[in-house]
């Protein structure tokens, strides 16, 4: 074995000692041992260094794209923002040739279809400024564009509470309804928490509840306004993420001849509802739905097999880490539990549904629990067991392994559970690093973004990602730093070049990142 990249998802280093920091509070003897014995430093995982707007927190998709590409990958969120800015008359660089949003063929086709069929345009997506799955400003622009195009529009609002404050939905929906009043269109027809509308683990019963509200106007709750929908939910003890699908006022359902514009720019949590609305592979949920004849447009490509019009098609970086490792005749193992499996495969491979020659994939099922604070250890031990077994039996040249716990449990806002999650990962980190070393491999330990390093307060839990620097530890096969120093000022784009150096593979010209070892 030559090298391993171990990603502690959601594990960052918070310089502020005055916050509830689950990473700092946890007993992390293995991490501390490797930090002290190996070369160590920090990496930037947010803002322009990963292709996001300045100050925007990173996330797992962005992180793994940058890690695999070995360069800064301009993110769809920035592309959408810039297209809207051009529509408003601002000058923005346009290396992708996206143009302005009012010239976007896919978006315009939604308006055209609705006009031709005397229908409406239905905007749906996550209504928040979290910036992980969507920006509320993008929705506001679409509503303005609908008014400009003379189309009646309604909104199906999915509330956040995970990448934002658990009760921030009240403010976001207040702003949205005021904007809809101002534009004369785009009012909210349904409200659903992301737990239902944006499930990604094939809990189709949850997705179906959101679908029923949107298509059949059938839900367990009704409200006179979008704001009332969430405040009633708070009274029931459910924060934004868990708002049960609610019908708002007497607004219309999605009907034949209507269009849908799903404005989330991140794909993973938009796929299931999109499949239901477009009737794609309905056997997965027993074919229980019968969607109307509509035109469904997605802001970005949610899945290349869907065949749906896409406003901002993907940019696929070539010569990614996996591709280069494969083309040089080396083998690689990608390993994660369900929650992060797409990240170590699809996103690490540049957002491509491709499995390279010599690429071995192992997926460990995530626990079947409503929220991961109920089982903070998740499947970390099983991930490690699988990794060690694969190292011993297959001896891959490169291992990429993701531990999901600090991120997934951090999102629950439960501080004690997050501490347990960090400690569970630390225990497994010790086992895995020793197994890689025993096989003669170099180890890089890092993270794709922060989360558990800031859990907010008891009264106001913080459930979103952070912009804090993440650790980077280099452990040589002998357990030391191997006489190498970790340079400062690095970012995620520098990990692939570092791994290639450790594997004695020449870095391709397309990778602009630089080795982190001196």
Please state what every model-predicted region is.
Residues 1-518:
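Feature captures the catalytic ectodomains and active-site-proximal regions of enzymes
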């Amino acid at each position: 074995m030559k090298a391993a990249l171990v990603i502690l998802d959601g594990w960052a280093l918070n310089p502020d000692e005055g916050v509830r920091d689950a990473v700092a509070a946890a007993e992390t003897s293995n991490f501390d041992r490797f930090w002290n014995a190996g070369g160590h430093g920090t990496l930037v995982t947010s803002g322009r260094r990963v292709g996001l707007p300045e100050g925007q927190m990173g996330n797992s998709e962005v992180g793994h794209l940058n890690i695999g590409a070995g360069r800064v990958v301009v993110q769809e969120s920035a592309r959408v923002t810039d297209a809207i800015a051009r529509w408003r008359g601002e000058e923005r660089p346009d290396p992708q040739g996206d143009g302005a949003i009012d010239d976007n063929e896919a978006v315009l086709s939604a308006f055209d279809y609705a006009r031709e069929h005397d229908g409406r345009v239905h905007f749906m997506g996550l209504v928040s400024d979290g910036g992980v799955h969507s920006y509320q400003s993008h929705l506001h622009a679409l509503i303005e564009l609908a008014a400009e195009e003379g189309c009646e529009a309604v909104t199906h609002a999915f509330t956040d509470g995970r990448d934002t404050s658990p009760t921030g939905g009240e403010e976001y929906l207040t702003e949205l309804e005021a904007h809809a009043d101002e534009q004369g269109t785009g009012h909210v027809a349904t409200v659903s928490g992301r737990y239902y509308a944006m499930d990604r683990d094939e809990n189709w019963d949850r997705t179906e509840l959101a679908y029923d509200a949107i298509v059949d106007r059938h839900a367990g709750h009704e409200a006179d306004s979008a704001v009332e929908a969430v405040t009633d939910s708070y009274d029931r003890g459910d924060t934004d993420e868990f708002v049960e699908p609610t019908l708002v006022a007497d607004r219309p359902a999605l009907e034949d001849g209507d269009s849908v514009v799903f404005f989330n720019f991140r794909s993973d949590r938009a796929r299931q509802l999109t499949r239901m609305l477009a009737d794609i592979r309905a056997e997965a949920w027993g074919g229980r739905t019968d969607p109307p004849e509509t035109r469904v447009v997605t802001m970005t490509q949610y899945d290349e097999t869907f065949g749906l019009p896409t406003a901002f098609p993907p940019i696929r970086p070539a010569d990614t880490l996996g591709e280069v490792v494969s083309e040089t005749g080396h083998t690689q193992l990608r390993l994660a539990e369900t929650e992060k499996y797409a990240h170590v495969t699809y996103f690490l491979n540049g957002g491509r549904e491709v499995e390279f020659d010599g690429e071995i994939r192992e997926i460990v099922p995530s626990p079947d629990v409503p929220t991961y604070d109920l089982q903070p250890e998740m499947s970390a031990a099983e991930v490690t067991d699988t990794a060690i077994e694969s190292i011993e039996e297959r001896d891959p040249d490169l291992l990429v392994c993701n531990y999901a716990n600090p991120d997934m449990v951090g999102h629950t806002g439960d501080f004690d559970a997050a501490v347990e999650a960090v400690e569970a990962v630390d225990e497994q980190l010790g086992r895995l690093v020793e197994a890689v070393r025993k096989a003669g491999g170099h180890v890089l330990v890092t993270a794709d973004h922060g989360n558990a390093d800031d859990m907010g307060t008891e009264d106001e839990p913080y459930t979103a990602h952070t912009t804090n620097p993440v650790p980077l530890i280099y452990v040589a096969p002998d357990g030391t730093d191997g006489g190498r120093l970790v340079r400062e000022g690095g970012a995620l784009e520098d990990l692939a070049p570092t791994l290639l150096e450790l594997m004695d593979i020449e870095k391709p010209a397309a990778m602009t990142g630089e080795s982190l070892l001196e």
